[in-house]
């Protein structure tokens, strides 16, 4: 993730010399997100019976920082970094119904987003947005009690985002955004169990596919 951030910063710096300086903007956003862990039934718990669902969603507040450029015809292009956020999800099995897996997934993203603005008047506009980028996911957790830990693991996945919203510009150079977007962050898994299970094997692993539905409020300032 550090290398990707550095590479993106270099691209933006290099491109800045060829673009009009007064078309750049910076943005700060706060979001309320519902994180969802899909496909937890793909977790490896051999010989432990059928999958038992637990908590597969978690609501959390987070934030992001963005640097963008205003293009002709009401298009915008930006690089956005979403700050790290950890969420915990649970699942179990019929043979050990009280020994739940507690799957902690720490996520952060670096996205390139495109926006199309549709002005309604001098101050209000609506927009649609789509983005592609990188999601860095780290999985860890435990089973039954915190002493029964899994090894941690991490993945870098292709992430995508789709959304819409409304913008209000109270004064020149300042815009306030209210928006919704769906973000798919791909699959993640922990390492194997770092504890002795009933078979005396390291053959268990927590797995999930992570997404989020986000409502955000943002402040944009044009340079």
Would you name each region that the model predicts?
Residues 32-63, 151-157:
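Surface-exposed strand-loop-strand hairpins of Gram-negative outer-membrane beta-barrel proteins
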Residues 157-168:
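Transmembrane beta-barrel strand/turn architecture of Gram-negative outer membrane proteins
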Residues 48-54, 95-103, 145-152, 201-207:
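Extracellular loop and loop/strand-boundary signature of outer-membrane beta-barrel proteins
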Residues 55-61, 104-109, 120, 152-159, ...:
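Short sequence motifs at beta-strands and strand-loop junctions characteristic
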Residues 86, 90, 170-223:
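Predominantly the C-terminal beta-signal and adjacent terminal strand-loop region
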Residues 1-23:
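Cleavable N-terminal export/targeting peptides
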Residues 38-46, 88-96, 138-148, 189-196:
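Outer-membrane beta-barrel translocator domains and adjoining extracellular loop/strand segments
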Residues 21-23, 30-34, 65-142, 168, ...:
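Gram-negative (and chloroplast) outer-membrane scaffold detector with strong preference
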């Amino acid at each position: 993730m550090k290398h990707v951030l550095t590479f993106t910063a270099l691209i933006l710096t290099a491109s800045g010399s060829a673009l009009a300086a007064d078309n750049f903007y910076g943005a700060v956003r706060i979001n309320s997100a519902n994180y969802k862990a899909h496909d937890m039934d793909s977790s490896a718990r051999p010989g432990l019976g059928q999958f038992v669902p637990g908590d597969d969603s978690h609501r959390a507040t987070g934030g992001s920082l963005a640097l963008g450029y205003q293009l002709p015809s009401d298009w915008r292009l930006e690089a956005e970094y979403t700050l790290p956020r950890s969420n915990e999800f649970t699942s179990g099995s019929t043979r050990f119904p009280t020994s739940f897996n507690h799957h902690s997934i720490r996520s952060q993203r670096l996205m390139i987003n495109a926006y199309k603005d549709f002005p309604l008047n001098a101050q209000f506009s609506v927009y649609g947005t789509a983005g592609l980028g990188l999601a860095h996911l780290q999985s860890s957790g435990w089973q039954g009690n915190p002493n029964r830990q899994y090894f941690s693991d991490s993945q870098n996945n292709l992430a995508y985002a789709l959304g819409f919203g409304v913008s209000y510009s109270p004064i020149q150079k300042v815009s306030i955004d209210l928006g919704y977007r769906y973000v798919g962050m791909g699959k993640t898994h922990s390492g194997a169990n770092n504890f002795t299970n009933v078979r005396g094997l390291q053959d268990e692993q927590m797995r999930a596919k992570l997404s989020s539905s986000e409502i955000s409020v943002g402040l944009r300032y044009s340079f």
